[in-house]
């Protein structure tokens, strides 16, 4: 979209701002898994929104992942930096004319931070409607309906749920030969 298209649509559209992380998800999944899954869900939701105009913004790839820093490939922001960057992106969306903004989370470590940013922004901008949610929480009722949402596996971390999503999105990026075979290892963030 160009600036004029965004300007025309923003006042009546919902902006979806995907947030994620670049971090390890076991030896078998790519480090960009959180971003790829969150973007796919955001785009799918936008397509399925019917008459509701949904514009998906570019994602905030980098999350707060200090607990994964011992692993190679992790690109993490300190929680204060992440929150400040996200606040300013939400502010930019509002300045572009969006009145309704959903911060869509794709990384467990961001949950409390995105909720706080949404609260802080609404307190400072009472006319704004900003919500924050993880994609797996939004999808949980449908996942439970097909018995895919046991408490231990959604979203998990590099476990069955996330690996299945990656296999669906781009199976070439999943190293099937490196998938842990013991159930206990599948959702362990240390693997």
Language-model features: locations:
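Extended, histidine- and acidic-residue-enriched regions that form the cofactor-binding/catalytic faces
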Residues: 1-102, 108-191
